[in-house]
Amino acid sequence: LTANEAYEFPMMVKSFQATYWEAAMKGMDKAAEELGVTYTAQGPNSESDIADQVNMINTAIAANPVGLGLAACDTSSVQGALQTCVDKGIPVVTFDTGIADAPEGSVVCEVCTDNNQAGSVAAENMYPAIKDVIANADGQVIIGEVNQDATGLNIQQRGTGFINKMIELIKADGKTVAVKGNEFYVNAAEGADAEEADADVVIQVAVPAQTT
């Protein structure tokens, strides 16, 4: 940063309704004060309002900011905006959610969790609590798994990480497993070895119609 110049950054969050994003903005406040810059936090009413967020991103880019912070509700919906950032020389930092196949040179930094590993760790910690139930069940066992959405890369990775690790653990104990429910997660699952009707364990995956 150069002295005597004003720097303002648009920061695109996924929603203003969740306390998660309120906490994130407190971190933005702290960093902005330390660096002597300002930022404008913007975001849709809910994480399901994908088109609204895309419009906000495009409006922010049109103002030629010095940089853009982005947590995309739907990673596939922002590819065009990212290409515009490349064309205009606007650096983008993604946070919370990385963006697969982002245009080359658009994203200069990602700040996010290893979401696949986070989902895997959740399965590893859950399995001991249900292992005996699965081993001793007289019939089919259903494991419910609910994901916030099927559009955000971070949520996709967490859900898939959980499902695939759970499949691995179930099969290691000699049981068969099937995955049913949301199409994205069913297709992303690896290692399921049975049809639903024949499986010892069924992982039932759901995604709500609306996300706040």
Predicted regions and their residues:
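A residue-level marker of the well-folded mature domains of exported/periplasmic proteins
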Residues: 1-212
